[in-house]
Amino acid sequence: MDSEVAALVIDNGSGMCKAGFAGDDAPRAVFPSIVGRPRHQGIMVGMGQKDSYVGDEAQSKRGILTLRYPIEHGIVTNWDDMEKIWHHTFYNELRVAPEEHPVLLTEAPMNPKNNREKMTQILFETFNVPAFYVSIQAVLSLYSSGRTTGIVLDSGDGVTHVVPIYAGFSLPHAILRIDLAGRDITDYLMKILAERGYSFSTTAEREIVRDIKEKLCYVALDFEQEMQTASQSSAVEKSYELPDGQVITIGNERFRAPEALFHPSVLSLEAAGIDQTTYNSIMKCDVDVRKELYGNIVMSGGTTMFPGIAERMQKEITALAPSSMKVKIIAPPERKYSVWIGGSILASLTTFQQMWISKQEYDESGPSIVHLKCF
């Protein structure tokens, strides 16, 4: 493999697709993992209307489109739309010819086997890539924090995973998944804003609520205490201007929405919170590795970006752990992109170059080669 050609790194998330070149310190392109199709027949002839739109363009025309996310809960469910997203990534965002660059893709932990094969097949057969590799998202986050052992809490838009990793290998028996992530927090925020009299219902309005969430929400260190403070003073209240100029006020909703991460029962989900799930995952690991895991709890993904989340996590895990245990939460400022950054680091290592699946190997063995070479 020629060392002159930069590998491409694509992190396909349920909410956002992050793409760029190996060796860069941040992704060049970050756009919503959305494919939109017109809701109505176009009447303006020669308007150059397309039958589908991807990413930001779909987002900006969201008023006239039906938006679909091909990745649900971290796993690809619609391959035709997924192909459109990859096509858009190569040709419109990165402006590269995929047949000239090795491609590293990321996948969710516990991704079904046939999904990995399908991914491999599309990249080699549709896009003709010269070499390919697929890597587990949480493992890449750990790499980007400079560790090979630790437990990663990766929470994005569609799914949250807790993945313990020892010496670079994930421990599959202890991986836990919670189907509760950013999109659910946004939906919950829509619901509690409705109780205040602000109604948001369409897919387009949901994006406004997502923006409110990202700009104003935070995690309370002590929920009950914070609720009390909020009821007695207006210190918590903030205002937000909607696209039409109307200004709304948001109070205890700011911390009530992200609280769902610690108490999924408010969403009528029978799951344990992210704190309890992290603890449960550690307890499923061998007793000899637990100490190292408690001391290396790494947060990654956009849903871990709420102010106050690391402090709250520290408090909750310390309460669950044995009393003498040193608990350390690592929440790097760039954690929104740490999966991508880890991929960028991995794909540019000289030692990694023999790990790629080459087109020749694919032609000889078919899609199942991915299970032999990527783990």
UniProtKB/Swiss-Prot annotation:
PROSITE patterns the UniProt entry points to: ACTINS_1, ACTINS_2, ACTINS_ACT_LIKE
GO molecular function, one term: ATP binding
Domain of life per record: Eukaryota
The protein's enzyme class: hydrolase
Subcellular location: Cytoplasm, Cytoskeleton
InterPro entries on file: Actin, Actin/actin-like_CS, Actin_CS, ATPase_NBD
Alphabetized Gene3D superfamilies for the sequence: 3.30.420.40, Actin, Chain A, domain 4
Catalytic activity annotation: ATP + H2O = ADP + phosphate + H(+)
Keyword ATP-binding recorded: yes
SUPFAM superfamilies registered for this protein in UniProt: Actin-like ATPase domain
Enzyme Commission number(s): 3.6.4.-
Main location: cytoplasm
Cellular component, GO annotation: cytoplasm; cytoskeleton
Pfam families from the UniProt entry: Actin
Keyword Coiled coil found: no
Family listed: Belongs to the actin family.
Purpose: Actins are highly conserved proteins that are involved in various types of cell motility and are ubiquitously expressed in all eukaryotic cells.
Protein's UniProt name: Actin
Species this chain originates from: Kluyveromyces lactis (strain ATCC 8585 / CBS 2359 / DSM 70799 / NBRC 1267 / NRRL Y-1140 / WM37) (Yeast)
Gene that encodes it: ACT
